[in-house]
Design a protein with these regions (language model features):
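C-terminal catalytic "cap/lid" subdomain
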Residues: 3-189
Length: 189
């Protein structure tokens, strides 16, 4: 029952996000990873990339999210948004990944947005990168930043932006111009 309840909660949250995007004029579609993820011992082995590619080609914004997944070793597990994006990025080769959250970007110990984080600047920031305000089984901001820097190292040229999904119109502006100095850019160099 717990697995199904978590799946339901993730899907309901995604529906709220998609509804808000549609209301703001963004043609979004929710694509649940649980429908196609094959996971073994917590690691995604396969994930259908075709629906995401088709959505992008049709001019739709795939609203991807962390979700439950069946796991051949554990029975069930949670796959984070970052794990889903990491898997998809290897096949789809995006120039940018945009990660909307509750804060204006990645915050330093003083609560200020860090405009840019690279592998070289990360060690000084790690002590400030705690977990999230609520329960986050995927590791919080430190894990998000580290995994996205790992992905940008594996995919040279990939840039990632962490920004507030609560600012009206910001997602639309970033979709049109991802170089805008909003939030925090994560890149290998």
């Amino acid at each position: 029952l717990g697995f199904a309840a978590v799946s339901d909660a993730a899907a309901r949250l995604n529906r709220r996000v998609v509804s808000a995007l549609l209301a703001a004029g963004v043609p979004a579609i929710g694509l649940p990873p649980s429908a196609s993820a094959a996971v073994a011992d917590g690691v995604i082995q396969a994930l259908a990339t075709g629906p995401v590619a088709a959505a992008l080609e049709a001019g739709l914004l795939p609203a991807l999210f962390g979700d439950v997944a069946f796991d051949s070793v554990r029975g069930g597990t949670i796959v984070s948004t970052e794990e889903v994006l990491g898997y998809l990025a290897h096949d789809l080769r995006p120039a940018w990944l945009l990660l909307a959250g509750e804060t204006a970007g990645v915050l330093d110990a003083g609560g200020r947005v860090v405009p840019r984080i690279t592998r070289a600047t990360l060690p000084a920031l790690l002590p400030a990168l705690g977990g999230s305000r609520g329960t986050d089984v995927t590791g919080g901001m430190a894990t998000k930043v580290t995994s996205m820097l790992d992905l940008s190292a594996a995919r040279p040229g990939l840039r990632v932006r962490v920004f507030s999904g609560l600012v009206p119109g910001l997602l639309t502006r970033l979709l049109l111009a991802p170089d805008l100095p909003e939030g925090t850019e994560l890149s290998e160099t």
